[in-house]
From Swiss-Prot:
Presence of keyword Lipid biosynthesis: yes
EC top class named in words: transferase
EC number: 2.7.1.130
Family of the protein in this entry: Belongs to the LpxK family.
Name recorded for this polypeptide: Tetraacyldisaccharide 4'-kinase
Positions with a binding annotation for ATP: T53, C54, G55, G56, A57, G58, K59, T60
Example GO BP: lipid A biosynthetic process
NCBIfam families for the chain: lpxK
Keyword Transcription found: no
Gene Ontology molecular-function annotations: ATP binding; tetraacyldisaccharide 4'-kinase activity
UniProt source species: Bartonella quintana (strain Toulouse)
Pathway: Glycolipid biosynthesis; lipid IV(A) biosynthesis; lipid IV(A) from (3R)-3-hydroxytetradecanoyl-[acyl-carrier-protein] and UDP-N-acetyl-alpha-D-glucosamine: step 6/6
Gene: lpxK
Length: 343
């Protein structure tokens, strides 16, 4: 079931957090046990790009950035994804021409524009499928907490607007596992954006002694936005972040509609949005991820004044992706050497 994250997750003090804390202790113990178990190993370098919390953090454009750089370096990258929100069961290699978001999920379909993508709840099986296709580098989209595949390097992405939320483990807060466990198993953190919420992230990550990197999301629709008035709608992890980005590009956001993450818009939803925009002489605005789901609707052709906002990651360190990939390969070679010594 696709739901929105509760508002109290992002507040320091809440009665609901207090009420759910005993349940979060149990969930935290279970997630810790999952994370420290022995992992299946594949004979390919594996970079995991995950996050600490439930809800969107900006992983998808980061995975895309790594896929692009990996190809520039001569790799044939393959992306392992859960295919969240899609109906397909078992392992499936995405065909962008024939698959749609209802079958394989919106994120996986976006990623398939840039690399081979295999979806499965078992990431080891998905990685094996990519190996059969000739891929020589695995980019794991999420999966840090579920621990279904050994990873040579784990990069965790944090949305600076939300940080770690109230710092509690699900369901009392947004954390997918205790911070102590996640910190011990990660390799570095990528903080996207800047806000007051990120100060705590910087403090806590710095205390671990592990690397903290910085980046910003850059809209690719900037030339189309200035001076226009919008009805903006989105079904993503943090719709307010999208609405704010339009304003930062000198667009005027008159109306907003927020839907649950990975929401599939009905024909009625879209007709209502089109009608509202026409009545108020507004442009429609949505995200590239939302648009992959809109493409399954019969009303898509009626979305005349629609601007689709895609984003890319602007890393503070220009050669960031190359640097991380070099570290991944170094660890992979070390892993192979140790294996050969033992066997």
């Amino acid at each position: 079931m696709l739901i929105s994250t509760p508002h109290f997750w992002w507040k320091d003090k809440s009665f609901l957090r207090f009420l759910l804390t005993p349940v979060s202790w149990g969930y935290g113990y279970f997630s810790h046990r999952c994370m420290v178990r022995e992992l299946p190993v594949i004979d390919l370098p594996v970079l995991c790009i995950g996050n600490f919390t439930c809800g969107g953090a900006g992983k998808t454009p980061v995975v895309i950035a790594f896929a692009k750089v990996a190809k520039e370096l001569g790799f044939l990258p393959g992306v392992v994804s859960r295919g969240y929100g899609g109906a397909v069961k078992g392992v499936h290699l995405i065909n962008e021409q024939f698959d749609n978001a209802r079958d394989v999920g919106d994120e996986a379909l976006l990623l398939a524009r840039h690399a081979f993508v295999a979806i499965s709840s078992n990431r080891y099986v998905a990685a094996q499928r990519l190996k059969e296709e000739g891929c020589n580098l695995i980019l794991m989209d999420d999966g840090f907490q579920s621990r279904r595949l050994y990873m040579d390097y784990a990069l965790l992405v944090v949305d600076a607007m939300r940080g770690f939320g109230n710092g509690a483990v699900f369901p009392a807060g947004p954390l997918r596992a205790p911070l102590k466990t996640q910190f011990s198993l990660m390799d570095s953190v990528l903080l996207i954006g800047h806000s007051d919420a990120c100060e705590n992230v910087v403090f806590l990550v710095t205390r671990t002694g592990k690397a903290l990197h910085h980046a910003h999301l850059k809209s690719l629709a900037s030339d189309e936005v200035m001076g226009k008035s919008f009805l903006a709608f989105a079904g993503i992890g943090n719709p307010n972040k999208f609405f704010k980005s339009i304003k930062e590009l000198s667009g005027r956001v008159v109306q907003t509609y927020s839907y649950p993450d990975h929401y599939f818009f009905t024909d009625t939803d879209l007709k209502n949005l089109i009608q509202q925009a026409k009545m108020n002489n507004l442009w429609l605005a949505t995200t590239a991820k939302d648009y992959t789901r809109i493409q399954t609707s019969h009303v898509q052709k009626d979305l005349k004044n629609l601007i689709v906002f895609d984003v890319e990651v602007d890393f503070v360190q220009e050669d960031f992706c190359r640097m991380i990939l070099e570290e991944v390969m170094s660890r992979f070679r070390e892993r192979k050497t140790l294996f050969n010594l033992h066997f």
